Design a protein with these regions (language model features):
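Compositionally biased terminal segments of proteins
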Residues: 1-178
Length: 178
């Protein structure tokens, strides 16, 4: 479990050192709970680090080795299975939060995270994250959330029941409908 930005940064720094020792250069694009911790000072607990890994596949051995060596990491602590769930639209507003020999780490933009959290709609944690991201983006109307989602996903992919739940939640927090 990761509970602080410092924990994740230390772990990613170690990953970079191990990659560099093998002559590897890897880029991570972090999404999900880890992105909320790293980029948006959201106090949260996340079990893994969801990331798009480029090039894919080259770090599996290093990730497994770290889990075994440390003993406090699950084998899937760096989760690349999230890749098929990411928007196809490039995230032009992502930003580099860490660059060490062997590793460059970008965090998803608030817009992309908002769209991903809204699409996932998995319950209270995602609702809270959507609200935090609305504050960061200074959104005043629920319609702005759906505009961002449509722009990121290319079409409305938010399930109607999730859209209704998010709308109700955000309106209860002071966002207008229009």
């Amino acid at each position: 479990m990761f509970t602080t930005k410092d924990e994740i940064v230390a772990l990613l720094t170690e990953l970079g050192e191990r990659l560099d020792a093998r002559g590897l250069e890897v880029e991570l694009y972090i999404v999900g709970g880890a992105a909320m911790l790293l980029g948006y000072d959201r106090s949260a607990v996340t079990r893994d680090i969801d990331a798009l890994i480029t090039p894919s596949g080259v770090i599996d051995e290093v990730v497994d080795e770290m889990a075994k060596d440390r003993g406090d990491l699950p084998p899937d602590w760096l989760n690349s299975r999230v890749a098929p769930l990411l928007p196809r639209l490039a995230d032009s507003r992502s930003w580099e939060m860490l660059s060490v020999a062997g590793l460059s780490v970008e965090v998803a933009s608030a817009e992309h995270l908002l769209a991903m959290k809204a699409r996932a709609g998995r319950g209270p944690r995602d609702l809270q994250d959507v609200a935090v991201l609305c504050e960061i983006l200074e959104l005043r109307a629920v319609s702005q959330v759906w505009e961002i989602c449509d722009r990121v996903w290319g079409e409305s992919v938010i399930r109607p029941e999730v859209r209704a739940t998010i709308t109700e939640f955000l309106e209860s927090r002071g966002l207008s409908q229009a």
